[in-house]
Amino acid sequence: KCLVDTFDRNFQFQVEHVSIAKQADVVMIAPASANVIGKLAHGIADDMLTTTIMACKCKKIISPAMNTNMYENPIVQDNLAILQHYGYEVIEPASGYLACGDTGAGKMPEPEMLLEYILREIAKEKDLTGQKVLVTAGPTQEAIDPVRYITNHSSGKMGYALAKAAMLRGAQVTLVSGPCAIEPPPFVKLVPIVTAKEMFDAVTSVSFEQDIIIKAAAVADYRPAKVFDDKVKKQEGQMSIELEKTDDILQYLGDNRVPGQFLCGFSMETQNMLGNSRAKLGKKHLDMVAANNLKVAGAGFQGDTNVLTLITQDEDVSLQLMSKEDAANIILDKILSIMKEREQ
C-alpha cells in the first residue's frame, strides 16, 4: 500500500503517519532527494513521508540519489552530516550514469544492496552484538612457477556463510579469505590473501583481539620448497617437486589462545572422520571441530549444502543434510551455548 495523503480518513487509523511509524522496525528512504534530506535535517514535516519519519523511533537509513553537483553541494553535505548526528545511517551513493545524463557519484545503489542494509537490522536476533568474530575461508594457492600453483577444491561458501550469519547476528566480523569466485558478504572486513603464509600472517596479526575464531579455510599443508622464476617447460622423463610444510595456523592459535576465546576448526576427511577430528580437537587445543566426510553426498566441496558433525570435548552432534547458511547458524548457536555455559 502506498500512502500519500497525510490525513486520509479512509484508513483504519485516524493519524496514519503516527501509526505506521510505531509499527516500523527500520525505515529506509531510497532514493532520498536533496529536498527530502534538507527537510529531515531541519525538522520540516509537511507531507506523508516526512511526518512519518519524524514520528519514527526505529533505525533510519537514508540513500541519497541525485545529480553529482547537487550531491557534492556543501549544503547537501552539511544536511547529511546533521542527519548522521541524529543517528541516521547514510549510504554512500554509487557512481555511474545518472538520470540527467551525467556520469558520476549520486546513483542509488542496486535494490539488492539496499535490502542487505535492512536484513542486517532485522533478519536475525542480535545475540552476537559486542563480539568480535574472525572467520577464515576458501583455498590457498602455492606457486610452482609464474603459471602453475598447488591448491584445492574449496569454494569458500561455508566460510562466507559463517561470516554473513555472524554479521547478521550483530558481530563485528573479519573475514580472511583465499581466492574465491563468490561475492563476499556485506558489512564485514575482508582481508584477501593468496598463500598459506599470507593467511598465517593475516590471522595471527588480529587473533589476539577476537572473541571467536572459526577457521573454515582449506589451507595448503605443503608448498613448493622452490618457486621457479620462469615457466617450467615440458621435458623428457619424470619430474618431481620438493615440498615443505606450511605453518599450522590452527595449532598456533590453539597454543597461543587468549583467555576466554572460542576456537573452532574444520576437518574435511575421507576416512575415520570422528577419530581424526577428535584427535585434532585435542592436539590443537580447540573448543569445537566441525567435521565432514568428502565421500558423503552433499558434504563435499563447491556445493551449497553440507553434512556436519560438531565435535566438542563432551559430545558429537550429527547434523542432517542442510544448506550451508543453515549449518552456519547452527554452528554459531552451538558456540554461543558453550560460551554461556562457561560463564555460569
State where each predicted segment sits.
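A cross-family phosphate/adenosyl-ligand binding-site feature
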Residues: 1-60, 67-156, 160-344
